[in-house]
């Protein structure tokens, strides 16, 4: 796999950091999750499969010294804490990159490491709001609607951070030294929205209130419709040639339903039409055509769809949980899902990792007794 041989330390946190670490792990990196000694995100971290866990008390010298030894053998550190947290423990970039000049110190935060909001708490909805993108989501005459915590947390945050890490690794192959990555979820979300910012003056695309433009459900030919069996079909017939095919499959002429006129009237007609057949019946009509009409699948049904099944996009676990396989697909060195490996328990690999660092058994026993490490035998406070 492309990242084989890359060692990553992931300081335990909420979803964006674990997602970043998961991407690196699924493409070959060896990832150690550094948990707080008695505080575990294990119950809510669904992205820790294939990682190892060491539980350390970083607030005491013995714990931070162990962490420094890990850093000395690592290529990447993922830091999800607010600005100043690592510095107060003397584990900031200046200290750690002094130990390991090749270290890539990836700092993944909501608002970034400087600016008036840098030290504020926040979540996906807050970062998306500040990026300007939240203002685009929602129906006409309705308030902005958050599209679950996908854009800022995972795309603008975890994925963008992983991209930065890969860029830094590539640059290091030439310079021989690491660097600090400031991966802000506001920055990342805004950058994801580059096309929206740059297309504001494209004729016909924007210029109307939210929910009244071509790409935000403002038209009848770019929307979703309920079917007879309470499922949904989505329509994205933007180009005129595709719109003609769409109408043809419905048995409607362009004179009856012109593309760029009477949007609401046409939407009402389509709502009635789509309720006349089930989702499966509509798929039988539109599949294999250029009408740009596809079913809206739920998370349980995606694996059984013919297209997804042939491409092996998803896998179904023994417990029935459906999960996606790694993307993109590399022809020689593809990623590999770690889902078959269970999520590591807090401190489960502490002894194993310390042994690799040449700690003796009696030293490990003393570290446990002194509350410096946790090897997973105690109950964690959630």
Per-region residue spans from a language model:
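Eukaryotic N-terminal low-complexity, Ser/Thr- and Lys/Arg-rich leader segments
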Residues: 1, 378-382
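Conserved small-residue-rich beta-alpha loop and adjacent elements
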Residues: 2-39
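A structured beta-alpha segment of the ubiquitous adenosine-cofactor-binding alpha/beta core
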Residues: 9, 47-99, 275
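Active-site-adjacent "lid/gating" segments in soluble enzymes
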Residues: 23, 27, 87-233, 237-238, ...
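Glycine-rich phosphate-binding loop and adjoining beta1-alpha1-beta2 segment
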Residues: 26-58
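Aromatic-enriched alpha-helical interface/lid elements that frame and gate functional surfaces
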Residues: 220-293
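A glycine-rich dinucleotide-binding beta-alpha-beta segment and adjacent secondary-structure elements
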Residues: 288-340
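Flexible, small-/acidic-enriched active-site or ligand-binding loops
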Residues: 318-368
